[in-house]
Amino acid sequence: MTAETIIINTGAVPTILPIPGLAESKFAVDSTGIQRLENLPKRLGVLGGGPIGLEFAHLYNTLGSQVTVLDAADTFLPRIEPSIAALAKSYLEEDGIQFLQGVHTQEIKDGQNSLTVVTDKGDFEFDILLYATGRKPNIAGLDLENTDIQVTDRGAIKVNRHLETSVPGVFAVGDVNGGPQFTYMSLDDFRIVFNYLTGDGSYNLETRNNYATTLFIAPPLAQVGLTEQEARDKGLPVAVKELPVAAMPRGHVNADLRGAFKAVVNPETKEILGATLFGEAAGEIINLITMAMDNKIPYTYIAKQIFTHPTMAENLNDLFAI
C-alpha cells in the first residue's frame, strides 16, 4: 500500500499481567469479554482499581453481583483529591462493593465452575474475574520492525508534536501513540493532524488545551487540571474550597446528597488551577470549568455568573467564591 498520508489508529488492547494461570483461565475476562457474558455472575472479582475496573464493578454491583475489587495499589484512586476519593470509596462500599488495597495476585486456579485468585492476603473464589490491569498500544501485527517507525520504551509509536512518526507522512493517533487513553483524545488527535495537513500546524501537542476526565460511577466523578497537592508541589499560590452536595439546592431536589465539589485556584492571578466534581451532572459541568481554564476566565467571573435555578451548575457560584 502506498499513499501520501498514512494514519495509524489501531488503539490499545488489555494488558495481561504475567500471573500464572491468568491467560489460560476460562473464567477470566477482559473489558470486552465481560460485555459478552450470557449470565450474571453471582461473585465477580475485579483485578485492578483503575477507571475501567471501577466502572464495571459499579455496573455489576448494580445488576446484583457480589463484587470484590483486588487492587495492587495501596491507595484508592491515588490521582484524585484524597477527600473526594475517600467519599467515592465509602459510597461504593455502602453499595456493597468490597475493596482490598495493596493486594498482590500470585496465581489463578480454575475449578470446575469457578476460579480461585491466590494472593498474598488470602485466596478468593469468584465465578468470573475481570482483569482490568491497564491497556497497552496495539502494535501487534503492524510489523513495525520492518519499517523505520520508532516505538517508545512502553511500546507506543513515537510521534512528534504534530503526531507524525519517525517516517514522514505517517501519523499515529489515539491510544497507539501512548497519549491519554480516551475516545475524545483520539478525536482531538485528528484535529492536530488535520491542522498540520491543511493549516499552519499551530494546534499541536504543545498547544493542546486542558482536558477533563470522568469516572462513570454513581454519582459520577470528574476532574480537570491540578489537584491541591499537585499545585502546591509546583510552588504555586493556592487557595481551595470544597462544597458538599448536601449544601446544594439541586441535590435536595434530586434526593441525592452524596458527593462534593472542590476547586483549586491561584488567588494572585485569579486563574483556575483545577477542579474535582463528585455529584450528579459532574461529567457535564466539568466541561464548563475546562472551557473557563482554556480561555483564562478568572474564577471570580464564575463566582458572579448568573446560572439557572435549581441546577447543579449554579453551585459554581459558591464553589468559586473563594
Which role does the model predict for each range below?
Residues A12-P14, G134-P137, V245:
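Short glycine-rich anion-binding loops that position phosphate/pyrophosphate groups of nucleotides
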Residues E24-P41, F124-D200:
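FAD-site-proximal beta/loop scaffold in flavoenzymes
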Residues M1-F27, R43:
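Glycine/serine-rich phosphate-binding loop and adjoining beta1-alpha1 elements at the start
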